[in-house]
């Protein structure tokens, strides 16, 4: 997801619970990438989704539980401290005389405009003023994001007139269209498009081969949710007008009929009136059922002898029938060749780009998946010739767009997108990458994408810049990859007074610059600093044209990263022009050693990194030290005596480790870029380093170190015993003795957190009289008492005037887990109090971070006084995860309260079922070389696994893949993607590492899982990968007992108890009773749910759901084997009156008939053999109804008959043979006898007669269908002659015969009723019956019914409904599955 911030949207809360549950934005808002915040003028509307602790799909939002607010309001998000001096633009960094008073800070028109696109803070403006030709010229930046709009303001040309955008690529595959189908044009220049539409190609288009490749796509699959919403609204308005017009006509027709016939007694007139009424009712009903799935666009691809060309037919998007025609389209080719783009229609105003891959077999239509990417690109490089103050940081740089935010997933990044983007960046020889996306990670500096980036940085000298995250203000909240990867420059978000006053339009700006409140902080869990540098984290920058505005305000580390990236482009522009060697190692060192520190305390570096970057100083540094080796100093830290784990810094935060001296081994390994000369660079490398500690009283280091190419180790002693409570930050760094002015060559962060212990009983800790102003943060560290599992907190505020908004975070770091974080963003009036409940991990240090939002309270002179009290509670159990093994035995659970007396109220509920599936097919293939060849030259392979499952009823299902889910950066697997489709190939769900539930109707489904990697052995191991299909079920509440036999005897029910401190108490958890288990559950399935034990101290209600209680734990039950079915043949000794020879003859006959049914009829030869066997069997078993029914079934299975009229006549004759073979009188007499059978023979006879009835009815039904189709094929009209009239009488005669045996309006036979009404020109009645049939279909959609509906609508002339149904046909019955 990307890294943008959270907003308060029209007062709608975005709430996130303690366990990181899903959160949503209000319908008036748009979810933004995790690093950015949208402006008040255009809010993106999207579902915000949790990814572990703070993840939204494709786009990162800062937090949940926080009231998201438009960034331009006075309550805009931001926080921490940082500022920049200079000319009234940036604001001061830290304190001092330079800080102008708030009262004296004023903007004029020019400084206001400049504040919208901040550059002064990082001194980019003065650098360009001093070096106008070093404005990014000669530098190419790859923007890894949601894609950007090449037509957006400022993204057309560079400052020196070159094309701004070099390429636009969809790396996700979300815009891919299968164009492998080849067609030829007829003599009129017509071709059939993939949608079935007839298209006219332009005669002037060059196509030497005459081959046209066709494909199609629903256009909403290319649009963002917000654009789709806008287009739907406009289309609905137009559709409603047309529908209302047709309703008026239908009502008038009914009125005219009633005026002519005051009394309707004649049966025929009654039917006529019913038909007119049905039309009115049908049209009204359509308005309620309307659901716009979007127009279909047809795509045509051809080779003009030089390049691949693309044209689209977008008539379905246009109101004007003469607009959007294929022949009028100006053909495009791959963007990088001609740099041209198209616009779908005037309605959407959405720009797109076309790229052709795989020799024309794949067309990629590239659109952005959110405005985020365009905004990011604008901050980095926009050029506005008419207003230079609105320029991006590097207006002379060129860019390529690498879309990693998948449109199918709401702009979530995918492994496929990330890998392809890196391949594209290297193919284009990009100098820089900006990536404003990220996720929480289990392990820092780990994973496949991290490995690929590190390889590119080392081998190709690629400089990779990324956002640090928006999960602050707590420490250890940096996200992957930006804040956790050594080879990536991670950027925090800073706001200056000028930005606050101008871009955010606050009433009164802060007196000095500061870090936004939500900007993520370090260190990483392995001790690395996390944030490298800071840069302005907000801007009013360009957005796509489909937003119907030129620019908007967004803020987040998503905005800070391109600001820094653009600044680095200025440095590279100068370095290239002046011949200074370019290396990510030297550039990073220059940035870190020249940044302006923000704040006065050492631990401020955990917030801002080395400080606010300064372009001019970094440039001077690079010039001065250009002759020194380009070396990266890799740091490996181990606790003495231990080889694992290896970390990149020293991070002490748990009680024991923080209260004793420890010795650490530091290994420093210089790393050169690949290709460095052994003799000229590696062997001569030798540096005499002076080692320093920022506080020798705490961190002691050797004085000197001689470092050579093979590296060197040294020891460090850390003594925290004299430190007070709180966070303490130190650094160990190495200085070149011969050139100390170079500054630190490497730094080793040392973070020590000394927690408070909670000694009193009951365990309560309080923090009194804390004083807050805007942006102020108070951090408290508490050693969570052993035995605590949750905490109840109260925050009291007073002493202020206007309302105050706060961020409250708690965070704990546990081994091999993502940081455990709880967060809330309450608003307080004065005085007021609020209570909170959050889970805790026993014995682990917990950070409590309380921050007054950076813009909250600006303009007020009154500080906020806060009292915060935490009371710890806990019910500990001997097993946190419970597994019931499927037997009848209960599980014993021991509970204990170590802190104080607690209520023990266990509640156990199973509410989901997980069914395991193995793949029925595994296809491994090599992908095309165009997009999927790595830097190493290795070709990526794809493994497609196919699974089948069936739902007996509609249900919400979610795929669950334990090996792969919930990890995108911190995994060695490259990519995963799944889609779920029905037997019609309609796709119901798509997903990746974070699967979500999807509502599916009853039916059979296919899940295809797509995995990518270049390692064939790894993919081979996954060919039998187990996938679980999880679905909701009715709650099963498990019983609790105080004795082991309780589940059987029903005695000793356990309800509740009071746990005394230190006294254990046990109870038994019984398995569910067999009658409560879901029916037809396969063996190996699991029922899953939650169990809770404790209860809130202030809650007197009886909780019925474990999730209502403070802490819940997973519980699962293995479904036991089903009861074996009895052998019915063995159980009942059959009494048969037939002789052995008669039974043998019967078995032979039935076997022959079965064999006939299994014969294929695909070729003429096979059909001839089938007919011969039919003739032979009919002569052998004359008038045997099951045989004749099987022959009729065989005829119906042939769908490719050449002469359709002859085929239907053959069906009629076969049906007649079935009808003639049945003694209808005997059958009628038997069915009228309702006596229940009393023996086996009578039961068999009853079943036989019922089968015969069904065969008779089916024959009559198929005969009627065939007769109707013959009439349709011949184009007969009512009253065309005696022969036709006689044929109609035969149809009616057949229909009336069918009504004697079955309900002709039932789902099985209703189609014939529809055709009958159609023949009688009662089209409204026909539609009513057909619509009822479709509504009653509770399984996979029947294509023939929808085709019949389309025919009826076309015959009536309701063109708006015809168009609507044709679009739905593309959804329900696509010709093939979409590409991955």
UniProtKB/Swiss-Prot annotation:
Biological-process GO terms, alphabetical: proteolysis
Catalytic activity: Release of an N-terminal tripeptide from a polypeptide
Entry-linked SUPFAM superfamilies: Subtilisin-like
Gene3D superfamilies in the cross-refs: 1.25.40.710, 2.60.40.3170, 6.10.250.3080, Peptidase S8/S53 domain
Chain spans, region Disordered: 1099-1143
Induction section of the entry: By cadmium (at protein level).
Protein's name according to its UniProt entry: Tripeptidyl-peptidase 2
Gene name of this polypeptide: TPP2
């Amino acid at each position: 997801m990307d890294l943008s911030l959270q907003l308060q949207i029209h007062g709608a809360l975005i709430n996130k619970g303690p366990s990181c549950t899903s959160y949503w934005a209000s319908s008036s808002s748009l979810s933004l990438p995790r690093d950015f915040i949208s402006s008040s003028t255009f809010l993106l509307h999207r579902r915000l989704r949790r990814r572990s602790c703070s993840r939204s799909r494709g786009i990162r939002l800062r937090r949940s539980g926080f009231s998201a607010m438009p960034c331009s309001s006075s309550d805009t998000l931001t926080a921490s401290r940082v500022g920049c001096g200079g000319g009234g633009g940036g604001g001061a960094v830290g304190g001092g005389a330079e800080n102008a008073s708030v009262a004296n800070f004023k903007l004029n028109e020019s400084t206001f405009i400049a504040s919208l696109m901040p550059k002064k803070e990082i001194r980019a403006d003065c650098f360009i003023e001093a070096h106008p030709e070093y404005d990014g010229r000669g530098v190419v930046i790859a923007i890894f994001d949601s894609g950007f709009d090449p037509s957006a303001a400022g993204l057309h040309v560079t400052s020196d007139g070159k094309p701004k955008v070099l390429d636009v690529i969809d790396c996700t595959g979300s815009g891919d269209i299968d164009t492998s189908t080849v067609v030829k044009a007829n003599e009129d220049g017509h071709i059939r498009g993939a949608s079935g539409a007839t298209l006219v190609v332009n005669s002037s288009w060059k196509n030497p081969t005459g081959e046209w490749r066709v494909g199609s796509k629903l256009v909403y699959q290319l649009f963002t949710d917000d654009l789709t919403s806008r287009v739907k609204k406009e289309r609905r308005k137009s559709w409603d007008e047309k529908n209302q017009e047709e309703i008026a006509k239908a009502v008038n027709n009914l009125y005219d009929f009633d005026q002519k016939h005051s009394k309707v007694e004649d049966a025929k007139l009654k039917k006529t009136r019913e038909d007119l009424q049905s039309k009115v009712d049908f049209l009204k009903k359509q308005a309620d059922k309307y659901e716009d799935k979007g127009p279909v666009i047809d795509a045509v691809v051809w080779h003009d002898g030089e390049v691949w060309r693309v044209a689209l037919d977008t008539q379905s998007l246009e109101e004007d029938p003469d607009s959007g025609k294929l022949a009028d389209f100006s053909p495009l080719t791959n963007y990088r060749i001609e740099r041209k783009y198209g616009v779908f229609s005037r309605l959407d105003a959405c720009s797109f780009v076309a790229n052709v891959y795989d020799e024309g077999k794949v067309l990629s239509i590239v659109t952005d998946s959110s405005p985020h990417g365009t905004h990011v690109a604008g901050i980095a490089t926009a050029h506005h010739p008419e207003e230079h103050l609105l320029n991006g940081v590097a207006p002379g740089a060129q860019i390529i767009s690498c879309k990693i935010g998948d449109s199918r997933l709401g702009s979530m990044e995918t492994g496929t997108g990330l890998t392809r983007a890196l391949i594209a960046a290297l193919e284009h020889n990009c100098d820089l990458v900006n990536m404003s996306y990220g996720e929480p990670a289990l392990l820092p500096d780990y994973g496949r994408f991290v490995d690929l980036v590190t390889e590119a940085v080392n081998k190709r000298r690629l400089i990779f810049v990324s956002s640090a995250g928006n999960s602050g203000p707590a420490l250890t909240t940096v996200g992957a990859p930006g804040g956790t990867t050594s080879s990536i420059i991670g950027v925090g978000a800073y706001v200056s007074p000028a930005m606050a006053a101008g871009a955010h339009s606050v009433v009164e700006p802060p007196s000095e610059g500061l870090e936004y409140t939500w900007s993520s902080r370090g260190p990483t869990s392995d001790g690395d600093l996390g944030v490298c540098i800071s840069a302005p984290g907000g801007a009013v920058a360009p957005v796509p044209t489909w937003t119907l505005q030129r620019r908007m305000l967004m803020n987040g580390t998503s905005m800070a990263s391109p600001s820094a990236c653009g600044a680095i482009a200025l440095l590279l522009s100068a370095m290239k022009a002046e011949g200074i060697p370019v290396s990510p190692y030297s550039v990073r060192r220059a940035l870190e050693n020249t940044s302006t520190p923000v704040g006065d305390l050492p631990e401020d570096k955990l917030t801002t990194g080395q400080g606010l970057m300064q372009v001019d100083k970094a440039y001077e540094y690079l010039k001065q030290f250009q002759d020194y080796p380009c070396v990266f100093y890799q740091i490996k830290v181990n606790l003495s005596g231990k080889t694992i784990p290896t970390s990149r810094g020293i991070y002490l935060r748990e009680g024991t480790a923080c209260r004793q001296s420890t010795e650490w081994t530091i290994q420093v390994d210089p790393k050169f870029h690949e290709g460095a000369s052994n003799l000229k660079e590696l062997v001569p490398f030798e540096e005499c380093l002076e080692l320093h500690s920022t506080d020798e009283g705490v961190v002691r280091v050797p004085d000197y170190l001689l470092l050579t190419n093979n590296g060197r180790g040294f020891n460090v002693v850390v003594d925290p015993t004299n430190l007070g409570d709180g966070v303490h930050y130190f650094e160990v760094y190495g200085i070149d003795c011969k050139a100390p002015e170079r500054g630190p060559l490497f730094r080793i962060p040392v973070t020590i957190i000394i927690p408070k212990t909670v000694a009193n009983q009951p365990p309560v800790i309080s923090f009194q009289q804390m004083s807050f102003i805007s942006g102020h943060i108070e951090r408290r560290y508490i050693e969570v008492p052993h035995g605590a599992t949750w905490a109840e907190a109260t925050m009291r505020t007073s002493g202020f005037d206007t309302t105050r908004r706060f961020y409250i975070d708690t965070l704990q770091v546990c081994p091999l887990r993502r940081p455990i974080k709880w967060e809330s963003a309450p608003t307080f009036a004065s005085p007021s109090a609020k209570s909170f409940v959050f889970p805790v991990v026993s014995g682990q240090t917990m950070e409590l971070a309380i921050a007054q939002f950076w813009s909250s309270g600006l303009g007020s002179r009154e500080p906020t006084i806060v009292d915060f009290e935490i009371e710890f509670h806990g019910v500990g159990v001997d097993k946190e995860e419970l597994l019931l093994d499927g037997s009848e035995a209960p599980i014993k659970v021991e509970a204990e309260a170590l802190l104080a007396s607690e209520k023990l109220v266990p509640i156990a509920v199973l509410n989901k079922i997980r069914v395991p599936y193995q793949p029925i097919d595994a296809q491994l293939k090599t992908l095309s070389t165009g997009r999927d060849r790595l830097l190493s030259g290795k070709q990526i392979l794809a493994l497609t696994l196919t699974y089948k499952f069936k739902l007996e009823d509609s249900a919400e299902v979610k795929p669950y893949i334990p090996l792969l889910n919930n990890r995108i950066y911190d995994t060695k697997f490259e990519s995963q993607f799944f889609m779920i489709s029905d037997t019609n190939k309609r796709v119901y769900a798509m997903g990746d590492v974070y699967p979500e539930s999807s509502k599916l109707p009853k039916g059979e489904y296919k899940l295809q899982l797509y995995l990518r990697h270049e390692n064939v052995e790894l993919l081979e191991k996954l060919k039998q990968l187990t996938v679980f299909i999880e679905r909701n079920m009715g709650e099963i509440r498990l019983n609790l007992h105080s004795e082991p036999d309780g589940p059987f005897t029903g005695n000793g029910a356990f309800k509740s108890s009071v746990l005394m401190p230190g006294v254990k108490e046990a109870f038994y958890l019984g398995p569910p009773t067999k009658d409560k288990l879901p029916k037809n559950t396969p063996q190996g399935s699991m029922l899953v749910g939650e169990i809770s034990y404790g209860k809130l101290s202030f809650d007197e209600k009886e909780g019925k759901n474990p999730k209502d209680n403070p802490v819940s734990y997973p519980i699962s039950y293995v479904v036991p084997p089903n009861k074996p079915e009895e052998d019915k043949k063995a159980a009942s000794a059959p009494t048969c009156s037939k002789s052995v020879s008669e039974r043998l003859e019967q078995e032979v006959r039935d076997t022959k008939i079965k064999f006939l049914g299994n014969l294929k009829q695909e070729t003429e030869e096979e059909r001839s053999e089938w007919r011969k066997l039919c003739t032979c069997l009919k002569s052998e078993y004359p008038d045997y109804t099951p045989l004749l029914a099987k022959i009729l079934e065989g005829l119906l299975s042939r769908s490719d008959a050449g002469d359709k009229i002859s085929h239907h006549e053959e069906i009629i004759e076969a049906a007649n043979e079935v009808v003639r073979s049945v003694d209808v009188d005997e059958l009628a007499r038997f069915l009228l006898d309702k006596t229940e059978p009393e023996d086996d023979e009578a039961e068999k006879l009853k079943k036989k007669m019922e089968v015969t009835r069904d065969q008779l009815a089916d024959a009559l039904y198929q005969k009627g269908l065939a007769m109707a189709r013959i009439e349709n094929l011949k184009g007969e009209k009512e009253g065309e002659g005696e022969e036709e009239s006689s044929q109609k009488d035969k149809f009616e005669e057949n229909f009336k015969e069918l009504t004697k045996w079955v309900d002709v309006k039932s789902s099985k036979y209703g189609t014939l009723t529809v055709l009958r009404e159609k023949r009688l020109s009662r089209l409204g009645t026909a539609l009513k019956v057909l619509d009822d049939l479709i509504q009653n279909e509770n399984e996979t959609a029947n294509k023939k019914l929808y085709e019949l509906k389309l025919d009826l609508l076309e015959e009536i002339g309701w063109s708006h409904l015809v168009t609507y149904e044709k679009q739905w046909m593309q959804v329900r019955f696509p010709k093939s599955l979409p590409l991955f």
